[in-house]
Amino acid sequence: MTQDYETVLKGKYPAKEHALRVADYVKSKVPDATGILYVEGRMTKMLEDNDEPEPFRQRRYFYYLTGCPLADCHYIFDLATSKSTLFIPPIDPDSVIWSGLPVSAAEAKELYDVDEVKYTTDVNAELARLGKGPKKTVFAIQNQVLDSITFLEFDEKNFSILKDAIERCRVVKDDYEIALTRKANAVSTVAHHAVVEYVKKAKNERELEALFLQRSVANGAKNQAYHGIFAGGRAAATLHYVANDAPLEGKLNLLLDAGTEWNCYASDITRTFPISGKFSKESRQIYDIVLKMQLETTAALKEGVIWDEIHLLAHKIAIDGLHLIGILKGDKDEILKNRTSVAFFPHGLGHYLGMDTHDVGGNANYADRDPMFRYLRVRGALPAGSIVTVEPGIYFCSFIIEPYLKDPVHSKFIDSAVLEKYWDVGGVRIEDNILITKDGSENLTPTIKDPDELEKIIQAS
């Protein structure tokens, strides 16, 4: 059942529950583990040759265990007592006049799901106290410990398990994390719809990016999950196009791939629509193929399905569609066997989504010799509670396709005369955020994708 995410988000981020899950994983790998888990948040870093700080993005491993967005913090979880302690910066009287009063320890205790809050001036003393005793181990993350932090009292220092433990736990989301993703999707949808309504009036891609950012911030999402893609015409054939600065005149479609972040949790949504308000014949043909790819692969999702097989299904649907309109020709089984469809659908079907847009835990194998699976960011079975993007696409990128046209293995399956009519389509991608459940899935993305509805909105704007 769809929960009221706003009600869920009135509670605290369940950091203690996350810490207990991570601790259980560590103990499963080191059964006699005693000691602590130790993580640090991101530290304030100044711009080079400047007295301004770099834009701050909280370290995700730290946030997962604390729910704390503050800079310059530390965290300890005692494996023996399951006590969690957050360390925050003390008040610096010299900075108050510039920045105002920071969060106090008492306030932080009310805000974050931890057992105790102390100041960072106490970190090393607390580490020394907890390290006393036989066979104590500190579990920390390699290259994420300040030089000023000392683990001298601990018999062992393990820098290999904790990162993996957090990443594995992050794959399966709890109700609060799902609510954060719903909220991010809701705000992103407002911004997406604003762009659809304005696209016919826009002269340049940058106007649309500015509008998306404005609507995001106005609705409380100050951070984007990633650099948005506002690709007009043939630029849509570039998968991660980020220039967003080209004129729109004379171009058929806009590919909009953008998502806001809500309290460190990402949304990742892509829509493609006609700038004029009416799809060209070729654009609509490709759109319908991609929409079928997305709807049918999403319908096949549930706990335990193998993502590789869902990706393969997407290619089969793409081959059927491209064969029907004449771009591909010959035996469809041979087209699949020779991987010719990779020329038009060169990326993976999707990825895990969470605190990072391309979230952890996917077990990708970029050394795979099979080009159909090489860029698949998730491999293996999907657990219930995971969130994946489903983002099939068909693209007409000359740099990618032309080598296929010159290769006799592939060229016999591609009708270059028919293909010539499709270059201006650029690329079509449709992307939603999907929650995997025991018996199926739930689409968390309410953004309009019906092609007739998109045309109506643009024409009426």
UniProtKB/Swiss-Prot annotation:
Requisite cofactors: Mn(2+)
Broad EC category: hydrolase
InterPro entries associated with the record: Aminopep_P_N, Creatin/AminoP/Spt16_N, Creatinase/aminopeptidase-like, Pept_M24, X-Pro_dipept-like
Binding residues for Mn(2+) 2: 257, 268, 431
Transmembrane portions of the chain: none
Gene Ontology BP annotations: proteolysis
Cofactor note (record): Binds 2 manganese ions per subunit.
An example molecular function term from Gene Ontology annotations: metalloaminopeptidase activity
Annotated residues for binding of Mn(2+) 1: 268, 391, 431
Reactions catalysed: Release of any N-terminal amino acid, including proline, that is linked to proline, even from a dipeptide or tripeptide
Alphabetized UniProt keyword annotations: Aminopeptidase, Hydrolase, Manganese, Metal-binding, Metalloprotease, Protease
Gene3D superfamilies: Creatinase/methionine aminopeptidase superfamily, Creatinase/prolidase N-terminal domain
EC number: 3.4.11.9
Family: Belongs to the peptidase M24B family.
Function per UniProt: Catalyzes the removal of a penultimate prolyl residue from the N-termini of peptides.
PANTHER family: XAA-PRO AMINOPEPTIDASE 3, XAA-PRO DIPEPTIDASE
Protein name in the entry: Probable Xaa-Pro aminopeptidase PEPP
Native species: Colletotrichum graminicola (strain M1.001 / M2 / FGSC 10212)
